[in-house]
Structure formats: structure tokens, C-alpha cells
Amino acid sequence: MELSPNNSTDQSLLDAQLELWHTTFAFMKSMALKSAIHLRIADAIHLHGGAASLSQILSKVHLHPSRVSSLRRLMRVLTTTNVFGTQPLGGGSDDDSEPVYTLTPVSRLLIGSQSSQLAQTPLAAMVLDPTIVSPFSELGAWFQHELPDPCIFKHTHGRGIWELTKDDATFDALVNDGLASDSQLIVDVAIKQSAEVFQGISSLVDVGGGIGAAAQAISKAFPHVKCSVLDLAHVVAKAPTHTDVQFIAGDMFESIPPADAVLLKSVLHDWDHDDCVKILKNCKKAIPPREAGGKVIIINMVVGAGPSDMKHKEMQAIFDVYIMFINGMERDEQEWSKIFSEAGYSDYRIIPVLGVRSIIEVYP
């Protein structure tokens, strides 16, 4: 029974509680997604042609017999959050027929784990790993106290994320695979949407490019461009060998190999203002003048750029707080402009074609 108009105050209280609950329990969306990834439910549905009943999913996933009834409840969360779709099985009423679960654009990104070029399973697995998630339980205390190190991750784990990747092979693989999966998707879109960014150059160095996913995508699309990756020695040691991409061990704070263009994909948001200026000054030393085609290509968020709907705005705001776990930050155009100016660059161009992220061309 609905509340009467005289009880509008009560309804307002219930509406407020609903909003509070929606945010409080939002972590269950992430945990449901993590479970779906662990069980490889998207693969199970894909193996049945993109639509599968619960019993068909059960035939493909490894599930303890006592958990069968709980899977239906998990799928209810995953369908209401649009990870999967649902439709009634033909031949019965909507009330008594077993639902058929279908793939959505979201769950298609979860097919194939690391075997699919555009699969985002490794990235989601990285972000939802306890090592990444646990520092945020300290976020409130972080705001109240001046800690010995401003990095929440280091405060929680005793060392920074890049130190941990160097010492923990399992975590290192998790991070490398996660970042590589994001690079494969976003650079693929960048090439299709703004191919002109990569035209007119004969060489490119991907600074902090990890195991080379972005550089390999660019090399494949533009075979005439000689691509290389600069990263720390322990990262380069695990890079693929059968590729046209050259891997160079080094430190971007010391020097960057010469090239027509430098790519910084999801790098600068890890660093504070002064460090960004240092990195970009080294980039400027590595590239020729603008007249000769020299430029820096940045793939990162520009807060306020791109689509203006609430989902995009919310994601930019959320990611800005997320990146605080390594003392990073997202920046608006004014903040980017100040960094470019201090690093000695003459001009820049923002190309907002990557959803919540943008391509920024920066010219010496």
C-alpha cells in the first residue's frame, strides 16, 4: 500500500533512505561482477550462442552443488545492473518459465578472459583485487591525519604499488595484464576515431608502456611507425620477445629515447604537478620541433571534457578519488594547461573521443 499524501514526510524519509542504501550497498555490484568474472559466466553464455538458461550456465561453470540456488540470486543482481540481459524462455508464461540470460555490450567485454583482444576481464580483476581495494577502507582516516607518506596504498601495504609489482610476481602479472587490456581497447578506439594523431610520424616511444599493448596496436595499424616502449627494468624483463616493438629499460625521470612522438597513456595521472612537469620536460628533449612533427600524445581524463551526461560526470569524479590510492589525480583543462606551460610547450589540442578520457596532443 502506498503512503497517503498526508505522509509525504515519511515518503521523503524512505526516499532518502533508498538513496543512502543505494550508495551504501553499491559495493555489492562490484562483488557480483567479481564473482561473474571468477565463474566465467560470460564465457558460459557465449558458448551457448549468446543466450543460456541457468541450467545451461551450470553445465559450463564450476559450482558447488549447494550453491546452485544462489546462482539465480547472483544473476538477478547482474541482470538488474545490466551486466547481463534476460528474456523469458519461449513456451511458457513470464511468471513460470525459466529465464534465458543473454550477453549485453558490458558482458561482451568479459568474454574470453585474456585471449580476446578487447576483453576487459583483466582490468576488472585488477581493480577488484583485495590489494587494490583494501586501502580505501583507510580513506576516512587518511583525510584526518598527515601520514608519513601521502600514498594510501603505501600506508596500507608498507610499500608503493610499483615497489610491490617489483617484489611480487603474481601482483605484477595482475597489474600488467590489467593495464594491457585497457590499453588494447582504448588505443584501438583512439586509432579508429583519431587516426590522424598517429599519421605523419615515423617513430614513437610509449613511456611507461608496460608489456607493450598500446605500442603493438599502433605498430600493427601503422607499420611504417617504429614503435618502442620505455619502462623499468623489471617490467621490460617480462615483455614479449616476438614483436616488432623494441623494449628499452630506463627511467622517464632521467631520460627518454628520441622519437618523433612520445605516448603517455594513463601515466601522468599517477604523478603530482611537479613530477608531471619533469616528465614532460624530458619528453620535450626527446622529440623534434613542432615543425618537424614532434609532439606528445597523452591519453588521460580531462575533467569536464567529453559527454556531459551524469554517468560520465560521475565516472570522472569517482576515478579521481580512486586514483588517490597512489596519490594520483585527474585534471581539468586549466590544470593541464598550466603543466604544459611550465614544461615549456607552446600549444595543445584536446580531442574528447574516448568516453571519460581524451586524447591530448601537446606541441613543443
Curated annotation (Swiss-Prot):
Homodimer. The lineage of its organism: Eukaryota, Viridiplantae, Streptophyta, Embryophyta, Tracheophyta. S-adenosyl-L-methionine binds at G208, D231, D251, M252, K265. It comes from Zea mays (Maize). May be involved in the O-methylation of suberin phenylpropanoid precursors. PROSITE patterns: SAM_OMT_II. Gene3D superfamilies: Vaccinia Virus protein VP39, Winged helix-like DNA-binding domain superfamily/Winged helix DNA-binding domain. This is O-methyltransferase ZRP4. Belongs to the class I-like SAM-binding methyltransferase superfamily. Cation-independent O-methyltransferase family. COMT subfamily. GO terms for biological process: biosynthetic process; methylation. Keywords: Methyltransferase, S-adenosyl-L-methionine, Transferase. It is an enzyme of class 2 (transferase).
